[in-house]
Structures are given as structure tokens and as C-alpha cells.
A protein has these predicted regions:
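Canonical AAA+ ATPase core
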Residues: 81-86, 103-111, 119-171
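Residue-level preference for the first positions of well-ordered beta-strands
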Residues: 34-36, 98, 138
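Conserved alpha-helical scaffold flanking the Walker A/P-loop in AAA+ ATPase domains
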Residues: 24-27, 80-100
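Pre-Walker A (pre-P-loop) alpha-helix and adjacent loop at the N terminus of AAA/AAA+ ATPase modules
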Residues: 1-43
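Helical mechanochemical/support elements of P-loop NTPase systems and associated helical scaffolds
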Residues: 3, 7, 18-21, 44, ...
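Walker A/P-loop
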Residues: 29-66
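Walker B catalytic acidic pair
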Residues: 39, 102-103, 114
Length: 171
């Protein structure tokens, strides 16, 4: 398909020398999957994700995960609105077409779980109210190589993700 070739060529103008990875990420995007990019710092993980977002024209958000990132930062929260006397949903970063989840290994297992649940179910639930994620919805996760993404109970997160079939991992 010529349109697909053109898209890949535009991305490869920014992401040089990683044609195979770019093609695999594109396959995941087209299939509605998610991608984990695991590599040492400074190798273009964020640049790759942003190139995809720009070329595809998708609404994009980036979350730089830290140890104090909480689930509500990602999925959203309800706020009491004095004027109406009710609660209003304030969407989190996940309400986008392409989410760059940068340095996922730096955040708590609780926050990782909230993100993974949304990735699998394609929706978020806040205060008993369910909100669908936009379509298309793709998460590009980045992690430092050798970060050992491990849940608090010692279960290796990558094995869980692969078993769920919600992403492919590229290094």
C-alpha cells in the first residue's frame, strides 16, 4: 500500500536506522495493539513515539512516569463542582489516541496496574462510572533496558503482558 509506505518513509526520516522496529510498531498500531520499547537512555524511544504521533496525526499525550505518579494522573478523577452540586469527571492522560508512557518502570505497581487494566479493557472506571477510551487507542511504553519491570509481588510484568497478548516488546 503506497499510503503505508509514505507514512513509514516519513517516520524513518526522523527515526534513522531502525526500520525493522518502525515497521513492527506500525503493525502494532494498525492491529490496535500496544508496544513496549525497552532500551538504554538516549536511544530514541521518545523520539520514535512522537514521530508516529506526528505523522499519523493522532491526538497524543506523554506521561513521564515517576515514583509519585498515581493512577488518577493516568485515568482521571472526579471533582466536586460547587455550581452544579455534583461531581464532574476530569479525564486523565489516557484519554488520547496515542499515549506515550515514558519510563513505566519508574512508577508504582498500583499505577502500572491502572494503566494495564485500561489497555486491556479499552475503558476506565472512576467512582463507579465507566468511560470508553478513544478509538484508535495505542500505548507506546518505554522502559530503561534491564529495568526489570517487576510487580510488587515479584511476578514479572512482561510475562503477564505477553500472556494477555496486549503488546509486543521490541528492544
Amino acid at each position: 500500500n503506497q499510503k503505508l509506505k509514505t507514512i513509514l518513509q516519513e517516520i524513518e526520516k526522523v527515526v534513522v536506522g531502525k526500520n525493522e522496529i518502525v515497521e513492527k510498531i506500525m503493525m502494532a498500531v494498525l492491529a490496535g495493539g500496544h508496544v513496549l520499547m525497552e532500551d538504554v537512555p538516549g536511544t530514541g524511544k521518545t523520539t520514535t513515539a512522537m514521530a508516529f504521533a506526528k505523522v499519523l496525526g493522532l491526538d497524543t499525550r506523554r506521561v513521564q512516569f515517576t515514583s509519585d505518579t498515581v493512577p488518577s494522573d493516568i485515568i482521571g478523577y472526579s471533582v466536586y463542582e460547587k455550581q452544579t452540586g455534583g461531581f464532574v469527571f476530569k479525564p486523565g492522560a489516557i484519554m488520547t489516541n496515542l499515549l506515550l508512557a515514558d519510563e513505566i518502570n519508574r512508577t508504582s505497581s498500583k499505577t502500572q496496574s491502572a494503566l494495564l487494566e485500561a489497555m486491556e479493557e479499552m475503558r476506565v472506571t472512576v467512582d463507579g462510572q465507566t468511560y470508553p477510551l478513544p478509538s484508535p487507542f495505542v500505548v507506546l511504553l518505554s522502559s530503561g533496558q534491564g529495568s526489570g519491570l517487576v510487580h510488587h509481588n515479584g511476578v514479572h510484568m512482561m510475562k503477564i503482558l505477553q500472556r494477555l497478548g496486549i503488546f509486543e516488546q521490541y528492544t
